[in-house]
Amino acid sequence: MRTVDLFSGCGGMSLGFQSAGYNIVAAFENWSAAIECYKQNFKHPVIETDLSIVDEAIIRIKKYQPDLIIGGPPCQDFSNAGNRTEGERAELTHSFAKIVTAVKPKFFVMENVARASESEAYKKARKLFIDNGYGLTEIVLDASHCNVPQKRNRFFCIGGLDQDDGFLSAILRAKQTVLPLSVRDYYSEKKYTLEFEYYYRHPRSYKRRGIFSVDTPAPTIRGVNRPKPSEYKKHDSDPVDPSNIRAMTTRERARIQTFPDTFVFPENTANTEQMIGNAVPVQLATFVASSLSDFVDGKQYSCNMQFIDWLKGNKGFTNRAAGDIVSRIIRANKIVPIKQYTGFDYVNKLDSTKSFKSIKPVVQSQVKRAVRLYFEYLDISTKEPEVTLHDSGT
């Protein structure tokens, strides 16, 4: 699929989609430092372009005839404060939508911070997508359940021309891992040498801890990397004494963003740290890319639609709530295959499984409730349990 990357930065999203088999034909970026970094890592052109000048951008992008446009418009202006303000960079979300709806690719993927979905700029963009015939899948993904060793929640709007809303939701939910990926497990998977058991990440407030273990996902990698201050005192939530604990190096942070060690970054440390923090984690991009490929190739989640209709019609669930139930059933099925047990026996087996016990109690309760609903549906419908990805043959 011919793909163009907008607001490409140093290339995290490009690399993720390229790794999933997409043909990246061009990238567009306006930060010269990121452009130079991109050029060192990709063979296709990266074009310096101010994407806020929409008419000029459309002319340039149309030349590449993309089937897919991907991109993460800058998100710094989506304030997290009580009185949320939006500036010029937030408006670039609307620019992205104007470009997409003028170029008219078959699909698009837009990434942003989770709170961007509530912004006025996104609401305008969303209306533009819908008015131009795009069905939308809107979802917040936790990167640690998408093959990234980092707790990073990101909003994705994935559009398909003439597709139904939510066309990719089931596949995205089905492909997520049951357990989050820890730093230790990621290092083991990649055969990296783990030189630390704990590390420092500068807290936004002195009321928060700064020391973290490699046995959990890392907190969100940000655009700055500060060393541990000499005056730092142990926080109540710090797992160990901080005396001999250091911050991650630039390359270690890049690994947490799932950039391979072969990816070349510039020597300017400040620029590099910002590029790393701003990037879409490579394997999160690959996760979304492979999910879209599954859809295009005809692979669909096969939990029959009658179950979803039953949840909405008989139990009063909204579309979103029914989707959450399905997501929890998928999660349970990955731990213990549903087809092997009846309802009561299945819940008992689930309770005795080590990986299920490691999940937070509140989540365990949610999963078991979802499973009970599914078996209740099966009892009255005589349907066979269907909770896998299958190839429909299309």
What are these regions (language model features)?
Residues 27-28:
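The conserved SAM/SAH-binding core of class I Rossmann-like methyltransferase domains
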Residues 36-46:
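Short, conserved SAM-binding/catalytic segment
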Residues 31:
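Conserved SAM/SAH-binding beta-strand->alpha-helix loop
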Residues 7, 38, 307-310, 332, ...:
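Conserved hydrophobic/aromatic "anchor" residues
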Residues 315-382:
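Non-catalytic DNA-binding core/recognition domains of DNA-processing enzymes
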Residues 294-306, 384-389:
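Low-complexity, Pro/Thr/Ser/Gly/Ala-rich linker/spacer regions in secreted
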Residues 2-24, 128-131, 154-302:
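S-adenosyl-L-methionine-dependent DNA methyltransferase catalytic core
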Residues 54-68, 73-220:
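Class I S-adenosyl-L-methionine
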